[in-house]
């Protein structure tokens, strides 16, 4: 792999590198001296194109591009619930404490608090056989959500070492697993997963149970199945966002992932304020104890809107694999499509209807197909995207 990759051209959020780079499609990279987060989106014979998820003002040709060797990922572990992230899973509350109200370029804040300790209860012992999706420990993440630590998909082996119950940080090793080749794998309280790849399931089940939304007009006239997908079309000011807020507050899902993709900042502020004031009718605890917010508002970089949708659905699939019914509200996929249109224009691709890229339908279907009522190793649950 070339160690001398440098910027050749800059066009808004699109950066190009000329010559042999050794980079792979969808590889995560750091661009420029400030190490802006980017992703390889095109590989031509002598030109590599990168989509940058941060503001590129101030970048100049000749600055270095650093390879990571891996895809864009989400960090999955305790501390996700009650948190608010940007489109690439940077914690906005922690950033506000260190950098103020605005995100500085190249901000590398860890998605989860690496110094916080969690009270872990171990569920396995040496000699147990584990495979991907099996649960080896748990901890109370909030008063209403018990976080379950799962073996990453694709990993299988025998437990050779287990730490005792106690308090651990997210990067502490609590279980050592030995695979068939004799290689040891250290399991911690967190794992990483590429946001564009759906987490595997055992099989899909037919959607037969209704999702009770808490809105009688929807439940009566437009019922939604658990594991289904629904869209809320409408013009400006017709109440799409308010309807989604109501669904997020009152639907009978265990976990709510609310993605503000290109929406106004005051709407996300309203959601934050109201969710903290309202009690969950099932538990009596604040709604924030089961909610994750991803805020990629209209004044944030356009390119990060695309990542925010995939980040949200990856977090939802993670909690789904624990056995929770998970509902994800994406507000809105139309602004996500507008972001794709802008990037497509920068790439000088042939436009389709209304200037949108020709691959928009396939991108939309990839997202909505990640919903479903499924069976994993031990559980049956859902993911529900709504626009």
Predicted regions, residues:
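Conserved small/polar residues in nucleotide/adenosyl-binding loops
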Residues: 379-386
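Interdomain "pre-motor" coupling segment immediately N-terminal to P-loop NTPase/helicase cores
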Residues: 66, 70-73, 86-91, 95, ...
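N-terminal accessory targeting/assembly segments
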Residues: 1-96, 101-104
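Conserved P-loop NTPase nucleotide-binding/switch module
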Residues: 239-255, 260-261, 265-266, 274-275, ...
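Nucleotide-state-sensitive switch-loop elements of NTP-binding domains
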Residues: 265-315, 350
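P-loop NTPase nucleotide-binding/switch module
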Residues: 98-120, 138, 149-150, 171-172, ...
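Short beta-strand segments of a lipoyl-like beta-sandwich/carrier module
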Residues: 15-17, 50, 59, 112-131, ...
